[in-house]
């Protein structure tokens, strides 16, 4: 009887030990230096004042041109380490609708990255979104916009 209880306790300790060895939801794998080029010409992206937390923000896309653009749900977050931007290795899944950003228009986008990135730790980050411009029917040029932010 004592052996059975001891075996059950030992198994319980092993299971708890194994589950404690993984990464917590607030840690992530920092990848290679980023090679993403960012443009802030016709379209800029900002964070709406008062909306930034360590797990979400409201982005504002502002079209400062007479052109029409499109964007989707995908985004990525990078972290600044030693003065360089680095990718964060996570698997993200997005629905792929296309949204219009008409000439001189602003659009607010609420994002919650907790499921993909977890709660961000103290540091400097940037959110990157791709923007598409149809320069000829069926032909698109894609560029990236980004906004930097700090988590205290």
How should these model regions be labeled?
Residues 1-4, 8:
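Positively charged n-region of N-terminal signal peptides that target proteins for export
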């Amino acid at each position: 009887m004592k052996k059975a209880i001891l075996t059950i306790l030992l198994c319980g300790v092993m299971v708890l030990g194994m589950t404690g060895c993984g990464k917590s939801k607030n840690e992530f794998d920092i990848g290679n230096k980023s090679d993403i080029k960012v443009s802030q010409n016709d379209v800029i992206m900002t964070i709406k004042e008062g909306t930034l937390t360590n797990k979400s923000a409201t982005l504002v896309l502002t079209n400062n041109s007479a052109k029409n653009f499109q964007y989707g749900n995908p985004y990525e977050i990078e972290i600044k380490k030693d003065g360089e931007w680095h990718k964060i290795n996570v698997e993200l899944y997005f629905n792929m609708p296309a949204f219009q950003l008409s000439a001189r228009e602003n659009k607010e986008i609420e994002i919650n990255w907790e499921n993909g990135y977890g709660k961000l730790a103290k540091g400097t980050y940037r959110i990157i979104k791709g923007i598409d411009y149809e320069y000829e029917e069926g032909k698109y040029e894609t560029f990236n916009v980004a906004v930097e932010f700090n988590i205290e």
